[in-house]
Structure formats: structure tokens, C-alpha cells
Amino acid sequence: EISACLVGSEMCIRDSPILVNFKDIILYHLRRLWHFLRTWHWDGKRFYHLYNLNTKIVLIVTFLLLVLGTVGIAVFEWNASFAGMSVADKWTQAFFNATCPRTAGFTSVDLAGLGVQTLLIYLFLMWVGGGSQSTAGGIKVNAFAVVVLNLVAVLRGTERVEVFGRELSHDSIRRSNATVVMSFGVLLLFIFIISILEPGTSLLAITFECVSALSTVGSSLNLTPRLGDDSKLLVALLMFVGRVGPVSYT
């Protein structure tokens, strides 16, 4: 089963078995390698549709988020939270803390001790989340990529939104834009209400807790235990919305 369906001359991104496609890709290249070892003749045939569109988008965006997140965290925490560590440990910590905001929410440092810039990187990574059909939360890298591609097309003044030589369908663009707008709307509403219920609390800390809850990450600046009962219920509701609400269906 491929991950994208043709709609006229357009390409419509759907939920797809990315891991299955990735497995097929690995097996294909292993077979080519085994054929070369047996015959010492390299099979030059290429199957250009081996990588489906969804797999390409997820792999590329995930790679970029990991690289940029790792470099960004390393730059801002090199002589701060990572001070006293070896160079190898600093890069390991940076990579680990760039990966976990989009997945399990594990942490190897006290998040409350991180700089504002690093926390903003955390917020962005938590908000984007993982790929579709994964257990990660967020708006999904697929929706994020489509929205960015649509923005690029608008800035260029073109009506067609293309990637890898194929045009994305209006349905994919519409669903992705709706997901992003809905995510921002829910976050703004809950952040606004909690900021009223918790006067004097840092707006950045409230935002961090809300984004973490909606993206079902689990990271915290140790604010939630100090919240009032009403605010805790709102945070719990955000977790529920992030897991079973429309945001999770992208």
C-alpha cells in the first residue's frame, strides 16, 4: 500500500505505513548488495517510486529537526547547562535533548535550568511532534511540512504546491492548515485561561506546560504540581485533547 493517492494530477498525502515502506527500502538495497556479492555485478536499475512521498517527507523533516535541534541546543547550552562536560558528552546531551521533546519527553538535565532560547527550541520541537501513525504527539511532521511548502508557494506567487516533482492536493493542504490553526487556537485559549487562574506565574512556563500537555510529551518545568486544581484539570484536558482530539488525526 502506498502512502499517497493520486487525485487527478495531484498527490494527496494520506496516513501510510511508513515503517513498512522503510522496511521495503532496506530489503531492496540488501538484495542489491547480496546480488553484487554473488555476481560482482552491480544492478544499476533504479525504482524511483520505491520511496513513497510520505516516507520522503517524514525522513527529511525528521532529519532536519534532529540536526537543527541538536546544533541549536548545543550552541545555547554549551557553556551553561552542559558546562563541565566533555565535548562528546555535550553533543550527546544536545542530541538526546533534541530527540526527546518530539517523542517520550525524557530529559537528562533540569529543564528549569535551561536558557530561554533553548526552551523556545523545546517548545517548537514539542509542537511539531513526530510522524503520522506514530505514538508521538504534536501536529505531525507531515502537516508541518505541507504548511511550510504551501507558505513557500504563496511567497513565490505560484498556485501549485509541489514537492519532489509532484503536486500536493488541496485536501492535504486544507487539512494541514486546519491542524495548525486548530493547534494554535487551542493553545492560546488554554494559556489565556491558565494565566488568569495563575496570576504572577511566568507566561513561558505556562506555555511550556500547555504545549507539552497538548503534544503528550510529558516534559515539565516543574510548574504543574504548583498549579491550582482548576489549572491542573485544564492541563489534564489538554492531554486528552492532544491524544484523542482532531489534532491527533493528522
What does each of the following model-derived ranges do?
Residues 3-4, 9-10, 14-249:
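Membrane-proximal intracellular helices of multi-pass ion channels
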